[in-house]
Amino acid sequence: MMASQAMVPLRQLFVDGEWRPPAQGRRLPVVNPTTEAHIGEIPAGTAEDVDAAVAAARAALKRNRGRDWARAPGAVRAKYLRAIAAKVIERKQELAKLEALDCGKPYDEAAWDMDDVAGCFEYFADQAEALDKRQNSPVSLPMETFKCHLRREPIGVVGLITPWNYPLLMATWKVAPALAAGCAAVLKPSELASVTCLELADICKEVGLPPGVLNIVTGLGPDAGAPLSAHPDVDKVAFTGSFETGKKIMAAAAPMVKPVTLELGGKSPIVVFDDVDIDKAVEWTLFGCFWTNGQICSATSRLLVHTKIAKEFNEKMVAWAKNIKVSDPLEEGCRLGPVVSEGQYEKIKKFILNAKSEGATILTGGVRPAHLEKGFFIEPTIITDITTSMEIWREEVFGPVLCVKEFSTEDEAIELANDTQYGLAGAVISGDRERCQRLSEEIDAGIIWVNCSQPCFCQAPWGGNKRSGFGRELGEGGIDNYLSVKQVTEYISDEPWGWYRSPSKL
């Protein structure tokens, strides 16, 4: 079935285990970026709906003095997470198709994402079970008259605000560890891609997740995201999205000294030396920038290529880029779909136009594919003749646009790689392992890829430096983002403390 023939399910907000219409009765259109057609609606939640969701989450934590969820053994919560994972796999094809319709992601990528969603729920089910073994862990003290242990308790009600580029996967990165820790959550997905997150609600209902443990409020950022960030009864906010929105979330949380985790933008480098297999390096370079239609926070969108191979490398990149199938995401073999919205489409075109006006050269792409009359499609774009003062070098485009600059020495490559306000990721491609190790240490980023770009595993931590945010998601520490550590120290001597003189001995 082609994208133009399909619609998305009609859903309401998910609050306290039930479907509820938004308080103000408004809905937002779902636009298929492939056809520009309206293919459904999502509820437009507002502050009233956020209040109801937060209240439901708080009630879920308190129910039965916490024994139903927050204080239940991690093994109990793990059963729910595994049940969710199983349902995601059961509905994998349906969910992947919905993401292709909703945000333009090629179907094969979306199907891969669903495997990752299930794997992430499974991984944090393991972490929930491991949490039982970590509870009451002893602390060695220098005084034998005391003993100490640590409790790890859920931080409370958490607000989770997620982006549109990996709609269900990015939500899962937050929902799975939060629930594993025993928190109750309110999820606010991007209004540009909320469809599969609402299907997650349906899955949670189907597996019998206790009411209020996960609530999902869709809507616009100012109407639903902002009230969630500033809500006095939300104990923590975790956000993935733009730098500008991240600043607003920090400002909203600051008056209550509320902890936040922020995974923001990037302008990541990929450094290619002259000792590489050029075809292999070209494919990783293009994958690092054009995967997910170029809409990845960690996209290695600044190519630094050694002068000795630059001409051949650029020629091969152009040939490979022209061979990428740009099409309806549901067509077999699609490798680049449309960007998510008209607004994003116009923004990317403006970046390309500005680069040309500043003197850059468009090697290939930069326009709508000739065979696609509708949809928010942009050909894979490669830009050269870049200076470090250009907007295209400094600002995150969030589209299929790669800018290229040459270097002559390793020191120059390191300097150019770090010439950014962001610090999410970086990649180095070289046959010299020691050189790769040096650059892994020198590049200022939270994630470094060697001889590849963009692999991501939920077993390894994810996060960035500088304007790419702070905190780390995933990995063994992922669950700790949603835990509060409590020290319990006990005096165990039979002797009195003896600091003050007892009145009975006067």
Swiss-Prot record:
Pathway: Amine and polyamine biosynthesis; betaine biosynthesis via choline pathway; betaine from betaine aldehyde: step 1/1. NAD(+) binds at T162, P163, W164, K188, P189, S190, E191, S242, F243, E244, T245, E263, E396, W462. GO terms for biological process: cellular detoxification of aldehyde; glycine betaine biosynthetic process from choline. One of its GO terms (molecular function) is aminobutyraldehyde dehydrogenase (NAD+) activity. Its EC number is 1.2.1.-, 1.2.1.47, 1.2.1.19, 1.2.1.8. It comes from the Eukaryota. The active site is at E263, C297. Keywords: Metal-binding, NAD, Oxidoreductase, Sodium. It catalyses: 4-aminobutanal + NAD(+) + H2O = 4-aminobutanoate + NADH + 2 H(+); 3-aminopropanal + NAD(+) + H2O = beta-alanine + NADH + 2 H(+); 4-(trimethylamino)butanal + NAD(+) + H2O = 4-(trimethylamino)butanoate + NADH + 2 H(+); 4-guanidinobutanal + NAD(+) + H2O = 4-guanidinobutanoate + NADH + 2 H(+). The record marks N165 as: Transition state stabilizer. The keyword Oxidoreductase applies. Na(+) binds at D102, L192. InterPro entries: Ald_DH/histidinol_DH (IPR016161), Ald_DH_C (IPR016163), Ald_DH_CS_CYS (IPR016160), Ald_DH_CS_GLU (IPR029510), Ald_DH_N (IPR016162), Aldehyde_DH_dom (IPR015590). Belongs to the aldehyde dehydrogenase family. PANTHER family: BETAINE ALDEHYDE DEHYDROGENASE, BETAINE ALDEHYDE DEHYDROGENASE-RELATED. Dehydrogenase that catalyzes the oxidation of several aminoaldehydes. Metabolizes and detoxifies aldehyde products of polyamine degradation to non-toxic amino acids. Catalyzes the oxidation of 4-aminobutanal and 3-aminopropanal to 4-aminobutanoate and beta-alanine, respectively. Catalyzes the oxidation of 4-(trimethylamino)butanal and 4-guanidinobutanal to 4-trimethylammoniobutanoate and 4-guanidinobutanoate, respectively. Catalyzes the oxidation of betaine aldehyde to glycine betaine. This is Aminoaldehyde dehydrogenase 1b. It comes from Zea mays. The gene is AMADH1B.
